[in-house]
Amino acid sequence: EFMPKNNNGDIIPNAGMESWSTKSMKKIIGSTNVPYPNAVKYEDATGTDKFWDSGNNGYMTSSGTDKLCTQATYPGMVGDYCAQLAAKYAVIAFAAGNLYTGDFVMDGTVGYAQFGQPYTYSARPAALKLKYAAEIGEINRVKNDPPVSTGIDKGRIFVCIVEWSDRHAVQSGTSVDKTTFWDPETVSSLNESKIIGYGSAYITESHTGSMKDLELPIVYYEKTAPPPTGNYT
């Protein structure tokens, strides 16, 4: 078992989204700096200084100004800043606002969201606690044979404890590879190895005005597994 059995919770680097810098990304001509949710700019960062990333890139508009994840403020947040996620559409693709632990790279107009970071657990997590606000709308743009084409455009928050040899890359942009998509609620392992546990919530209603508390209990596929020691956990 994870030991000790109970503690006050492990600290997630920059979980409050207080520290931001920039990341250089190519655009149609040249490059541009996009918001990067870590204290040290991407080109200089190492280790936990590169804990978070998003799909921010230079192709979202011709000017490269529309971003999927930005530093913001909102009533009810803890601290001075938070992250704002917003869906954006450009000539090449439509992309959801996103933020995750891992890395994001572009190869031309194709993007790869690479999920996974090294993380050391001092106890078996019971849940992930967070605050959020959301403005949910109707689906009004459909492309690439989506699983749902009508109704509300739900938000999704999930956390995973994994034992992976490598990051798992999801391919999107002008070329989508559905075989790279994954959902910890429906699979307990990927090519990179096993998913030990997960917590998940769908956001189906708008909640504005002030941030709301949310707790994601961890559901364990492996109820007695020791702390993961893989390259990405």
PLM regions with names:
Residues 2-129, 150-163, 167-233:
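Aromatic (Trp/Tyr/Phe) and Gly/Pro-enriched flexible surface segments
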